[in-house]
From Swiss-Prot:
This is UPF0149 protein YPO0911/y3298/YP_3608. NCBIfam families: PRK01736.1, ygfB_yecA. HAMAP family: UPF0149 (MF_00346). InterPro entries: YgfB-like, YgfB-like_sf. GO terms for cellular component: cytosol. Belongs to the UPF0149 family. It holds the Pfam family UPF0149. The lineage of its organism: Bacteria, Pseudomonadati, Pseudomonadota, Gammaproteobacteria, Enterobacterales.
Length: 192
């Protein structure tokens, strides 16, 4: 199955957000929407929540609502794809420094946790592998770096962290959106 919807480009979404004076980066917005989807958001209530969290409850004009709808649909489709097609929307390219990518990743993770926590308010009680992944995400959200570090080494480490975050998000999506099997009902025989 191929992904029919594609994510808006980072620069085009950055422009749409800045034109509407929304103080989030595309990475942060994608993290927020991804967190809500991974937390179990199934309906159009995500838009109201995004408006409340980012725009004082005011709906966005069509110039921003359409790219955000596209972002939501492509992200949802990627998360639900069994081929693990989900990717983080963080800046890429020759003109993007490793420090810019690290900052974007930190913002993505912070907003992912916000979106996830809005739909799963008892995150601190989640155990096992998913609980560990959430704890790791909290640590990654506070990601720091030394600008004197070897940028090539930092870039390699960053790619590993991005991959870990991607897998952790998929793990959360599986945990919070898929129906858990329930024990079969025990029917007592009827005595006549």
């Amino acid at each position: 199955m191929s992904i029919e919807n594609t994510l808006p480009t980072y620069p085009s979404l950055a422009l749409a957000l800045s034109q509407q004076a929304v103080a989030l980066t595309p990475a942060e917005m994608h993290g927020l929407i991804s967190g809500m989807l991974c937390g179990g958001s199934k309906d159009n209530g995500w838009q109201t929540l995004v408006h409340d969290l980012t725009n004082e409850g005011v709906a966005f004009p069509q110039a921003l609502s359409l790219p955000l709808q596209q972002l939501h649909e492509a992200t949802q489709e990627a998360l639900e794809n069994e081929g693990f097609m989900f990717q983080l929307l963080i800046p890429e390219g020759e003109d993007v420094t490793v420090f810019d990518r690290a900052d974007a990743l930190s913002g993505w993770v912070n907003h992912f946790l916000l979106g996830l926590g809005m739909l799963q308010p008892k995150l601190a009680q989640v155990k096992d592998e998913v609980g560990e992944a959430i704890d790791d995400l909290r640590n990654i959200a506070q990601l720091g770096y030394d600008e004197d570090e070897d940028q090539e080494e930092l870039a390699q480490s960053l790619e590993e962290v991005v991959e870990y975050v991607r897998v952790a998000a998929i793990l959360c999506h599986i945990e919070f959106t898929q129906q858990k099997p329930t024990a079969p009902e025990m029917h007592k025989p009827t005595l006549h």
